[in-house]
From Swiss-Prot:
Lineage start: Bacteria, Pseudomonadati, Pseudomonadota, Alphaproteobacteria, Rickettsiales
Similarity section: Belongs to the bacterial ribosomal protein bL12 family.
Keyword terms: Ribonucleoprotein, Ribosomal protein
Name recorded for this polypeptide: Large ribosomal subunit protein bL12
Function summary: Forms part of the ribosomal stalk which helps the ribosome interact with GTP-bound translation factors. Is thus essential for accurate translation.
């Protein structure tokens, strides 16, 4: 069991490039492929480095500054989050603060545009 812990520790310390190279070496030695059949059908041969840089699918909207129209920003935050007026005001007062998480890109962009229309500064992460 101690040997497995050592191996786990060594693997955890590898960089992404080193891990990709290790995958290639093991695939060649064992005659197997780490690519799943679904990925092969949809994307061809998968590159581990490319998978790590895949397009982001979930976004977080972060209010960084309120601008001049703080009351309008509070109203929009209240509508978007479903918070009460006091909670929405507190969230706005504590900027920079995440407003909503795990959003699709289109929904995150829509929220960002609504807030920026009032003069607020917003980031998507």
């Amino acid at each position: 069991m101690a040997d497995l812990a050592k191996i786990e520790e060594q693997l955890s310390s590898l960089t992404l490039m080193q891990a990709a190279e290790l995958v290639k070496i093991l695939e060649a030695k064992w005659g197997v492929s780490a690519v799943t059949p679904i990925a092969v059908a949809s994307a061809g041969v998968a590159d581990p480095v490319a998978e790590a840089v895949a397009e982001k699918t979930e976004f977080e909207v972060v209010l960084t500054a309120t601008g001049d129209k703080k009351v309008e920003v509070i109203k929009i935050i209240k509508d978007i989050t479903g918070l009460g007026l006091i909670e929405a005001k507190k969230l706005v007062d504590e900027a920079p603060k995440p407003i909503k998480s795990n959003l699709k890109k289109a929904e995150a962009e829509e929220i960002k545009n609504k807030l920026e229309a009032t003069g607020a500064k917003v980031e998507l992460k």
